[in-house]
Amino acid sequence: METIFAQSSAFGKAGVAVFRISGPKSLEVLQLLTGRKDFKSRLMYYQQITVPETKELIDNVMVVYFKSPGSFTGEDVVEIHTHGSKAISIMLTNALLNIAGIRLAEAGEFTKRAFLNNKLDLTAAEGIADLINAETIMQHKQAIRQASGKLEALYNNWRSQLLKILSLLEAYIDFPDEDIPDTVLNEVTNTHTILVNTISEYLNDNRKGELLRSGLKLAIIGPPNVGKSSLLNFLMQRDIAIVSNIAGTTRDIIEGHLDIGGYPIILQDTAGIREESSDIIEQEGIKRAINSAKTADIKIIMFDAEKLDSSINEDIINLIDENTITIINKIDLIEASKIFSIENKYKCLRVSVKNNIALSSILKNIENIAENMAGFTETPYITNQRHRNYLQQALSHLTAFSLDNDLVLATEDIRMTARCIGAITGVINVEEILGEIFKNFCIGK
């Protein structure tokens, strides 16, 4: 196995930068950089590091050596903590590249080696990637649980039950003349039924884990000049959309990212929807707005308190569902009695975006819907389409299983189910998917 290195921290100015080296030559490389031979595992040392050929000083650093297998990758590992300077990073990188037998790591290669050395399974590796990419508290909770092995434990439990069924069935096949009790087949049937129900229910999760991982899409919908862009700017706490009293100012979808109650929200301000427009570009914007609303996880539909009759058209009303927040904007410009019937019919919130009236109620409603759609529970959810695909295949094989069929074919259904579950955690040969998983990591991880 080659020795690899990379800067694990972000490149640029910082208090500290961390370089990681992994592989059989790690300790030798450290000795070349420092001129010291007596490093003990798991002790931090304050050292000078120099360019091996010229002895030019690179930096005063902290270094630590982890002897195999007691490291993240399971190999000999060295970490070098330098000052966070671009010049130091470049000098150290060049010095390492000039040492024979060491190369720059590929994206995710350290974690890939940890997997190959049985330090973690594939779900934990994916959890680490999600942890690095987590931007909200709820994303962190989900990722840290997965990185800690909770998904692995769940899938391994199912696989263990399948392997037990497999062993009982193979005993029937291999020893047909033996007097095997009927209770054995009863156990197979009962376990099979439980697994079918459990995996079916698990798949019927409304993609909560995947929504939390990727973010919930929220579309702001309404007629032109109702205050959609002003609401987007309020939610983002900065001006990212042009606000104008000219109808049709927003022509395309404007997007921003937000953390509401720990949930990742992808905000989309859309073109105003109206029934008639002679502007070809605006017509395309309206088409995109409707499509955006149809694919959104959460919708905010805005009505104009001064123009309720024109605000409410069929295209907009048809978009309302259980995950829609309807609001009447500009309530400061009209008497409450004039909007009472519409407010009750569509369960609207009364707000004024311009004057910051009741806007906190919008945030609370978004958080409540997000919690219902992607709320954190004790049972780990599916977080990745790869897992879902294998679980659907597993359920297909499991559903096909029947003791009324040929016993050899029934056994093969169980074997294929176990293989699908094993492919999620990586206990079977999954070389063809490793590149796809680890390419999404950053260099140095």
Curated annotation (Swiss-Prot):
Predominant location category: cytoplasm
UniProt: (6S)-5-formyl-5,6,7,8-tetrahydrofolate binding residues: 20, 79, 119, 445
UniProt-listed SUPFAM superfamilies: P-loop containing nucleoside triphosphate hydrolases, TrmE connector domain
GO molecular function: GTP binding; GTPase activity; metal ion binding
Disulfide-linked positions: none
Statement: the UniProt record of this protein carries the keyword Nucleotide-binding: yes
UniProt EC number: 3.6.-.-
GO cellular component: cytoplasm
Record flagged with keyword GTP-binding: yes
Top EC group: hydrolase
Ligand binding (K(+)): 225, 244, 246, 249
Cofactor note: Binds 1 potassium ion per subunit.
GO biological process: tRNA methylation; tRNA wobble uridine modification
Domain of life according to the entry: Bacteria
Cofactors (names): K(+)
Binding site for Mg(2+): 229, 250
Keywords: Cytoplasm, GTP-binding, Hydrolase, Magnesium, Metal-binding, Nucleotide-binding, Potassium, tRNA processing
Binding of GTP, residues: 225-230, 244-250, 269-272
InterPro entries to which the protein is assigned, alphabetical: G_TrmE, GTP-bd, GTP-bd_TrmE_N, GTPase_MnmE, MnmE_dom2, MnmE_helical, P-loop_NTPase, Small_GTP-bd
Domain TrmE-type G residues, every copy: 215-371
Subcellular location: Cytoplasm
Subunit structure: Homodimer. Heterotetramer of two MnmE and two MnmG subunits.
Family from the record: Belongs to the TRAFAC class TrmE-Era-EngA-EngB-Septin-like GTPase superfamily. TrmE GTPase family.
Function: Exhibits a very high intrinsic GTPase hydrolysis rate. Involved in the addition of a carboxymethylaminomethyl (cmnm) group at the wobble position (U34) of certain tRNAs, forming tRNA-cmnm(5)s(2)U34.
Name listed for the protein in its UniProt record: tRNA modification GTPase MnmE
Species this protein is from: Rickettsia rickettsii (strain Sheila Smith)
